[in-house]
Curated annotation (Swiss-Prot):
GO cellular-component term (any): plasma membrane
Gene that this polypeptide is encoded by: Gpr22
Name of the protein: G-protein coupled receptor 22
Signal peptide (UniProt feature, chain positions): none
Residue stretches spanning the membrane: 46-66, 86-106, 116-136, 157-177, 209-229, 315-335, 349-369
UniProt organism field: Rattus norvegicus (Rat)
PROSITE patterns linked to this entry: G_PROTEIN_RECEP_F1_2
Family label: Belongs to the G-protein coupled receptor 1 family.
Chain's role: Orphan G-protein coupled receptor. Seems to act through a G(i)/G(o) mediated pathway. May be involved in ciliogenesis.
Entry keyword set: Cell membrane, Cilium biogenesis/degradation, Membrane, Receptor, Transmembrane, Transmembrane helix
Membrane topology of this protein: Multi-pass membrane protein
Pfam families: 7tm_1
Membrane side Cytoplasmic: residue ranges: 1-45, 107-115, 178-208, 336-348
Tissues/organs with expression: Abundant levels detected in the brain. High expression in the heart (at protein level). No detectable expression in other peripheral tissues.
C-alpha cells in the first residue's frame, strides 16, 4: 500500500515526458530549416530557369534547321557540332531541373538518392561537354591545317561520337558505383553517405566517394591545353598562308602596275601615231586592268577580314569555355584537397550555374556564326515572311512591293560591249 502513490507519480512523470517529446518532434517537423537561404534559392533558380529557356530554345532551333537542310548534315563538322547541341538539350532537360530540385529541398529529408542522381548528372555534363569541345577543336584543326588530307572522315567521326557517348555514360555511373548502389547487399547501406549536398550530418570525407571529381578535373585541364595548342596552330597556319599570299599578291600588283604604266605609255605613243582605234583599244585595256586591280583589292580585304574573324572566334571559344568551367574545376580540386564543407558546396552550386551557361553560348559560337547556317536561317525567314504576306492579302487587290522580298533587288546589271565602249568614250568626246 505504501508504493502505490509512488508508482502513480512515476507513471504520470513518464507520460508527461513522452508527451513533451512528441510535441517537440511535431514542432521540429513543422518548422524544418531550409538547406539554403531564400535569396540564394530565388536567385539561382531564376538563373537556372533562364538557362533552360534560352538554351533549350536555341539548341532546338539549330537542330531543327540542321535536320531540315540535308546538305548541312552531310559534312563531318556539322555532325560533330550537332552532337554538342544534342548534349546541351539533354543538359537543359535533365541536369538543370535536378539542380533546381536540390536547391529547393530541405535539410531533414532523406535526399541521398536525389543527391546521388544530381552528382551523376553533374559528372555527365562536365565530362561530355569537355570531350565534345575537344572533338570540335580537333575538327577545326583538321579543316584549317590539313584541308586536303583530312583525318576525320565520316566513319571515324561516327566512331568518335560513339566513344564520346560511351565514356559520358560511364561518367554518369561513377557516383552510383562510389556509394555501392549496384551491390547485392541491403539497399540501406549507402543512404547515409551524402554526396556534396548540404546536410545536418557530417560529410563523408573518404576519397572513394569523390572518384567522379578525379575524372572531371584531368579531362577539363587536358581539353584546355589541347584547345590552346590547336587554336594557336590554326592561327599560325592562317597567318603563313595569308602572309605568303599577300607577298605574292604584292609582287603581282607591282608587276601589274609596271604593265599598266607600259601599256599607258604605249597607248599614248600609239594614240599620237595612230587614230581613234588605238585610243579605244587603250581605254579598253586600262578598264580591264582596273577591274582586275579592284578584284585583287577585294580579295585582299576578304582575307584580312577572314583572318580577323577566325582570331576573334578562337578567342571567344577559348575564353567562354574557360570562364564557364574553370571555377567549378578549381573548386573540385579544392574539395579533393581540403574536404567538403557547407561553404564549398554552396559555392559549387553557384559555379555550376556558370558552367550550365555553355548551353546558351554553344549555339552562338558554333552554329549561328557559320555562313552556311546563316544562309539557311535567312532563307527560312524569308520564306516565312513571304507565306505570311501571301496568307494575308491587302484589300482591293493592293500590291505590296517589299524590297526585302523582291527578287529584282539581287538581280545583277549586265552591260553589252557596245554600251561599255560608249560609256568609256563619252568623257573623251566631251573633253575634245
Amino acid at each position: 500500500m505504501c508504493f502505490s502513490p509512488v508508482l502513480e507519480i512515476n507513471m504520470q512523470s513518464e507520460s508527461n515526458v513522452t508527451v513533451r517529446d512528441d510535441i517537440e518532434d511535431i514542432d521540429t517537423n513543422m518548422y524544418q530549416p531550409l538547406s539554403y537561404p531564400l535569396s540564394f534559392q530565388v536567385s539561382l533558380t531564376g538563373f537556372l530557369m533562364l538557362e533552360i529557356v534560352l538554351g533549350l530554345g536555341s539548341n532546338l532551333t539549330v537542330l531543327v534547321l540542321y535536320c531540315m537542310k540535308s546538305n548541312l548534315i552531310s559534312s563531318v563538322s556539322n555532325i560533330i557540332t550537332m552532337n554538342l547541341h544534342v548534349l546541351d538539350v539533354i543538359i537543359c532537360v535533365g541536369c538543370i531541373p535536378l539542380t533546381i530540385v536540390i536547391l529547393l529541398l530541405s535539410l531533414e529529408r532523406n535526399t541521398a538518392l536525389i543527391c546521388c542522381f544530381h552528382e551523376a548528372c553533374v559528372s555527365f555534363a562536365s565530362v561530355s561537354t569537355a570531350i565534345n569541345v575537344f572533338a570540335i577543336t580537333l575538327d577545326r584543326y583538321d579543316i584549317s591545317v590539313k584541308p586536303a588530307n583530312r583525318i576525320l572522315t565520316m566513319g571515324r567521326a561516327v566512331m568518335l561520337m560513339t566513344s564520346i557517348w560511351i565514356f559520358s555514360f560511364f561518367s554518369f555511373l561513377i557516383p552510383f558505383i562510389e556509394v555501392n548502389f549496384f551491390s547485392l547487399q541491403s539497399g540501406n547501406a549507402w543512404e547515409n553517405k551524402t554526396l556534396l549536398c548540404v546536410s545536418t550530418s557530417e560529410y563523408y570525407t573518404e576519397l572513394g566517394m569523390y572518384y567522379h571529381l578525379l575524372v572531371q578535373i584531368p579531362i577539363f585541364f587536358f581539353t584546355v591545353i589541347v584547345m590552346l595548342i590547336t587554336y594557336t596552330k590554326i592561327l599560325q597556319a592562317l597567318n603563313i598562308r595569308i602572309g605568303t599570299r599577300f607577298s605574292t599578291g604584292q609582287k603581282k600588283k607591282a608587276r601589274k602596275k609596271k604593265t599598266i604604266s607600259l601599256t599607258t605609255h604605249e597607248t599614248t605613243d600609239m594614240s599620237q601615231s595612230s587614230g581613234g582605234r588605238n585610243v579605244v583599244f587603250g581605254v579598253r585595256t586600262s578598264v580591264s586592268v582596273i577591274i582586275a586591280l579592284r578584284r585583287a583589292v577585294k580579295r585582299h580585304r576578304e582575307r584580312r577580314e577572314r583572318q580577323k574573324r577566325v582570331f576573334k572566334m578562337s578567342l571567344l571559344i577559348i575564353s567562354t569555355f574557360l570562364l564557364c568551367w574553370t571555377p567549378i574545376s578549381v573548386l573540385n580540386t579544392t574539395i579533393l584537397c581540403l574536404g567538403p564543407s557547407d561553404l564549398l558546396v554552396k559555392l559549387r552550386l553557384c559555379f555550376l550555374v556558370m558552367a550550365y551557361g555553355t548551353t546558351i553560348f554553344h549555339p552562338l559560337l558554333y552554329a549561328f556564326t557559320r555562313q552556311k547556317f546563316q544562309k539557311v536561317l535567312k532563307s527560312k525567314m524569308k520564306k516565312r515572311v513571304v507565306s505570311i504576306v501571301e496568307a494575308d492579302p491587302m484589300p482591293n487587290n493592293a500590291v505590296i512591293h517589299n524590297s526585302w522580298i523582291d527578287p529584282k533587288r539581287n538581280k545583277k546589271v549586265t552591260y553589252e560591249d557596245s554600251e561599255i565602249r560608249e560609256k568609256c568614250l563619252v568623257p573623251q568626246v566631251v573633253t575634245d
